[in-house]
Design a protein with these regions (language model features):
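C-terminal interaction segment
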Residues: 2-10, 15-24, 45, 61-74, ...
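Acidic-basic catalytic patches of nuclease active cores, encompassing PD-(D/E)XK
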Residues: 29-57, 64-72
């Protein structure tokens, strides 16, 4: 005779919670925050017309279903083949098992080499194709590209073009300059606003000039 378990005896699968926050701040200071937002928002502009490129900043990435301890929150990550839109976290098994292909980390004075080495191992293990790490205080950029099962160091990043992003890195004595595919450089939020204001002012002047010539700008 088959003995059935009572309701109280049946094993109920535990529902695992995947927190949206690890309790850590997005950045430790204004310089680090500036670089995180500049890279993230400029990449959003580069891929604005591609609905299947998801870009996020400081979003928890869970690569393994069933284990909420295996996680990382890259300063910026890019996932090709995934739609744009809201996420509380990036649970890879809900994303066609696509790992972010490109990751950026911006160093702060508080970062330790051991901490960054652990991040590199994590990204190598869980499928990142390109990993870039920038230290804005010492103007140092290092990068790694996937070779088989590992992330191998890129010998020189001055002039390097990201295979995935098609952006170019340039190191000057004062800073890192990142160029979009069209050659224009990444701008801060303030610089983007100034550029927009300048363009609007030039449009106003042009419209006034056309009216002086008897041309209605709205008909053009």
């Amino acid at each position: 005779m088959v003995q059935q378990l009572s309701t109280s005896e049946k094993t109920v699968p535990l529902e695992i919670d995947y927190p949206d926050s690890d309790g850590q701040p997005m950045s430790d200071n204004t310089e680090q925050f500036k670089w995180i937002t500049t890279i993230k928002e400029n990449l959003e502009l580069v891929f604005a017309d591609n609905p299947d490129v998801f870009i996020a900043g400081d979003l928890l990435w869970y690569p393994v279903e069933g284990n909420n301890k295996i996680r990382q929150a890259p300063d910026t990550m890019v996932a090709f083949g995934r739609p744009k839109g809201y996420r509380g976290s990036y649970m890879q098994w809900k994303e066609d098992n696509i790992a972010p292909q490109v990751v950026f980390e911006i160093l702060s004075p508080g970062n330790r080499r051991t901490e960054m080495a652990k991040k590199l191992l994590f990204y190598a293990k869980y499928g990142v194709e390109e990993y870039y790490e920038y230290d804005p205080y010492n103007i140092e950029l290092i990068g790694f590209q996937r070779q088989g099962n590992d992330l191998e160091a890129i010998e020189s990043l001055d002039g390097w073009v990201s295979p995935r992003l098609n952006i170019r890195f340039e190191l000057t004595p004062d800073t890192l300059v990142i160029h979009r595919p069209d050659g224009s450089r990444f701008l801060t939020y303030v610089e983007l606003g100034q550029q927009l204001n300048q363009a609007q002012a030039e449009n106003v002047k042009l419209a006034a000039k056309l009216r002086e010539l008897g041309i209605d700008p709205s008909t053009l």
